[in-house]
UniProtKB/Swiss-Prot annotation:
Pfam families: ADK. PANTHER family: NUCLEOTIDE KINASE. InterPro entries: Adenylat/UMP-CMP_kin, Adenylat_kinase_CS, P-loop_NTPase, UMP_CMP_kinase. This is Probable UMP-CMP kinase 1. Consists of three domains, a large central CORE domain and two small peripheral domains, NMPbind and LID, which undergo movements during catalysis. The LID domain closes over the site of phosphoryl transfer upon ATP binding. Assembling and dissambling the active center during each catalytic cycle provides an effective means to prevent ATP hydrolysis. Residues 51-80 are annotated as: NMP. Its EC number is 2.7.4.14.
Length: 204
């Protein structure tokens, strides 16, 4: 069965170049509450939410060759190659029928950003960063018991190390361009969403 990454010809599988699409990247350490807050934004502001992690896990469940490779990488706390993640995101956006997207957990490094911009031809309207201390992130992940293979303390620490080394430079990049919107994610979910709500009401 063909997957989004089987493409022999890049041009045939590029994202549509929507001129009026609004894309918001949502970044934060593992356990920072990105998914919960994205669901709130979807409810109140009519965005379509895509989690890079959820799309990768769906590919794993499909039983494809790439799914097995993704599973191994996630278990080791490594970042999946950009081409795979971007093509999964492009396919999801193309099938959504919407033109307002929250992309959660992406880009995770400079390569992700370059591949997305080159394929999708879209720059984010802004980048939402949920800032939260490592100790709080570990506590949240260990207490949520979602049955995910990547929710054990060693893998959590690996994921946070990857986040610090690879994603914080991306956050600095967007901050230098005036596109970063930082939220204190150590507060309660309700307090965090109030800050998010005010932000989206002013930005969109």
């Amino acid at each position: 069965m063909e997957t989004p990454i089987d493409a022999p010809n890049k041009d045939e599988h590029e994202c549509p170049r929507w001129k009026k699409s609004t894309v918001v990247f949502v970044l934060g350490g593992p356990g920072s509450g990105k998914g919960t807050q994205c669901a709130n934004v979807v409810k109140h502001f009519s965005y379509t939410h895509f989690s890079a992690g959820d799309l990768l896990r769906a590919e794993i469940k499909s039983g494809s060759e790439f799914g097995a490779m993704i599973q191994s990488m996630i278990a080791e706390g490594r970042i999946v190659p950009s081409e795979i993640t971007v093509k999964l995101l492009c396919k999801a956006m193309e099938e959504s029928g919407n033109d307002k997207f929250l992309i959660d957990g992406f880009p995770r490094n400079e390569e992700n950003r370059n591949v997305f911009e080159n394929v999708a031809r879209i720059e984010p309207a802004f980048v939402l960063f949920f800032d939260c201390p490592e100790e709080e992130l570990e506590r949240r992940i260990m207490s949520r018991n979602q049955g995910r293979e990547d929710d054990n303390i060693e893998t959590i620490k690996k994921r946070f190390k990857v986040f610090v080394e690879s994603t914080l430079p991306i956050i600095s990049y967007y901050e230098s361009k005036g596109k970063l919107r930082k939220i204190n994610a150590a507060k309660s979910s309700e307090e965090v969403f109030e800050a998010v709500r005010v932000l989206f009401a002013s930005e969109t």
